[in-house]
Amino acid sequence: MIKWLARPADYGSVWDAMKAFTAARGPGTADEIWLCEHAPVYTLGQAGRPEHLLNPGLIPVVHCDRGGQVTYHGPGQVLAYTLFDLRRAGLYVREYVDMLEQATLATLRELGLEQACRKPGAPGIYVPQPGGELAKIAALGVKVRNGYAYHGLALNIDMDLSPFLGINPCGYEGLRTVDLAACGVRTSVERAGELLAAQLARAHGQAVQQRAAALAGVPG
């Protein structure tokens, strides 16, 4: 199931809802993708270090249970929260993160951004800039509990990027961030979100089918 949450969505409320959904689900629970835009907020993951919060100003800071360091969420950015059963899909966490990144790259190609890429050792999606610098356009952060994943990824569409200057994004000093608009791609949060959710659902669905076929002894 793919659903949009009310916008702007309060981060703490959505986080609580993800935890409740994950705690209540069982082997037969259908997977879901939640799409939203958040009100401005900095989130600090489990590995987050306070020194990467340079100047948060009046923007609230939430310490959460996803992996990773600090990032910013705000209007003009789409969040895709992937509440997936990784055991049903036969995915390890690294394979799951790879799937999220591949689905994001496929979405960006659909939108006309062919040059987006990954960066070894640094999860997320990047766009090469003049001079060879890589600017981050999508951030990932996941949590897996008892084989069930939640949290997900954030894709910058057309937003005020200045709050990223108040942090070391994802724990990298001087890391530049970029959005689709700055890359010359004009689209809406709604369209980008729908395309992203479709790619995520397709990739995860294929993994589930392949796992089921393997368990049934059907040649893939």
From Swiss-Prot:
**Alphabetized UniProt keyword annotations:** Acyltransferase, Cytoplasm, Transferase
UniProt xrefs under InterPro entries:
aa-tRNA-synth_II/BPL/LPL, BPL_LPL_catalytic, Octanoyltransferase, Octanoyltransferase_CS
EC code(s) of this entry: 2.3.1.181
The protein's annotated pathway: Protein modification; protein lipoylation via endogenous pathway; protein N(6)-(lipoyl)lysine from octanoyl-[acyl-carrier-protein]: step 1/2
The residues covered by the BPL/LPL catalytic domain are: 27-208
One Gene Ontology cellular component: cytoplasm
Question: Which Gene3D superfamilies would you find in this protein's record?
Answer: Bira Bifunctional Protein, Domain 2 (3.30.930.10)
Name the family: Belongs to the LipB family.
Give the misc comment: In the reaction, the free carboxyl group of octanoic acid is attached via an amide linkage to the epsilon-amino group of a specific lysine residue of lipoyl domains of lipoate-dependent enzymes.
Name used for this protein in its record:
Octanoyltransferase
